[in-house]
């Protein structure tokens, strides 16, 4: 519409699932209240321009999955399935200055989500860098020189880093356009450690509540149960992923093919899995084969991966007795 406007000078300078977020809080005042009816746009706002959809997309680039140039059959639909929301909150249990002005906070266990860090009295324009890791370098001879530092090798090409530029006064670091899988968060750019209670982790998931509980007299079995539910929560984030931390986080069909039955016992994931099965149909090959990865498409798995196009709808029906997914999916 001709009345639409846009602004490309807000505080979010960069946002990436793998690489993290860059946020300049010095720009907060310019955008304050922008999403309310009372907001009056300033000179930073420009008339929106309609741009033609040129070029093409590919469902995968694999054989039998041709380039897509015709978008006439594509349509917007309302979102369904469990949304991603905050389901838990952790507080750092310790902090260690592993190098001068390099502070590593321990959240107590691996988590999937974003930090929420309280600051006060910072000099305006201070650049604070946060990096995330699941483990630290252990005290072993081969890691001499790195002991105590966060280990990033298993994160691979993901930067897993957030940068926050302070405005001064009381403020909160709380990224919106990324997420991380981590236990340890390294903070640099501050002269002294923040109190552990100022460093929190907001746990995100598409599983809002678990429908099952399990407890025995064996503490190891109880811990295994907690590991299962915690890992399920961390890997059910919009899509069922293979991992929450490195430069992958993909909807590998083989993983959910073998786990879907367990998932249906743990929680009501009927709409979550319905959405995933639809994404499998969206990138289904012309010869009928389901992809190994959805919604991205492609992959290099075997029959087990594509079999999710059969096993997941069936497990949902077996658990929930709802035939709608079968009706939607049967022709595929």
Identify the role of each PLM range.
Residues 140-154, 270-332:
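Helix-terminus loop motifs that line ligand-binding clefts
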Residues 245-250, 299-302:
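A glycine-rich, coil/turn loop motif that links secondary-structure elements
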Residues 21-24, 33, 247-248, 266, ...:
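C-terminal capping/lid segments that line or modulate ligand- or cofactor-binding pockets
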Residues 252-258, 265, 302-306:
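An alpha-helical repeat/solenoid feature that recognizes helix-turn-helix modules
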Residues 250-253, 331:
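An alpha-helix initiation/capping motif
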Residues 1-245, 254-255, 271-274, 290-295, ...:
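Extracellular/oxidizing-compartment recognition motifs
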Residues 118-120, 188, 227, 231-235, ...:
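Generic, well-ordered alpha-helical scaffold segments in large soluble proteins
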């Amino acid at each position: 519409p001709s009345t639409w406007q846009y602004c490309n000078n807000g505080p979010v300078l960069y946002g990436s699932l793998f690489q993290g977020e860059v946020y300049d809080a010095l720009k907060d005042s310019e955008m304050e209240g922008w999403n309310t009816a009372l907001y009056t746009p300033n000179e930073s706002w420009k008339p929106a321009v309609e741009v033609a959809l040129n070029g093409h997309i590919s469902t995968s680039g694999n054989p039998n999955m041709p380039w897509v140039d015709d978008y006439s059959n594509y349509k917007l639909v309302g979102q369904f399935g469990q949304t991603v929301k905050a389901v838990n909150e952790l507080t750092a249990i310790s902090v260690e200055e592993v190098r001068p002005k390099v502070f590593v906070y321990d959240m107590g266990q691996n988590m999937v989500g974003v930090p929420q860090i309280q600051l006060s009295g910072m000099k305006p324009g201070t650049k604070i860098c946060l990096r995330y890791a699941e483990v630290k370098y252990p005290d072993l001879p081969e890691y001499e020189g790195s002991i105590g530092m966060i280990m990033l090798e298993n994160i691979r090409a993901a930067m897993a880093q957030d940068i926050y530029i302070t405005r001064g006064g009381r403020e909160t670091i709380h990224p919106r356009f990324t997420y991380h899988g981590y236990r340890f968060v390294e903070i640099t750019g501050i002269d002294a450690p923040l109190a552990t209670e100022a460093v929190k982790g907001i746990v995100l998931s598409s599983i809002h509540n678990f429908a099952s509980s399990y407890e025995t007299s064996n503490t190891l079995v109880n811990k295994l149960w907690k590991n299962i539910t915690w890992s399920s929560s961390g890997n059910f984030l919009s899509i069922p992923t293979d991992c929450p931390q490195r430069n992958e986080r993909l909807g590998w069909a083989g993983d959910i093919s073998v786990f879907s039955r367990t998932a249906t016992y743990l929680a009501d994931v009927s709409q979550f899995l319905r959405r995933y099965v639809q994404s499998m149909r969206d990138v289904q090959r012309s010869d009928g084969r389901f992809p190994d990865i959805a919604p991205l498409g492609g992959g290099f798995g075997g029959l087990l991966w594509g079999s999710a196009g059969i096993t997941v709808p069936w497990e949902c029906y077996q658990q929930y007795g709802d035939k709608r997914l079968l009706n939607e999916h049967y022709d595929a």
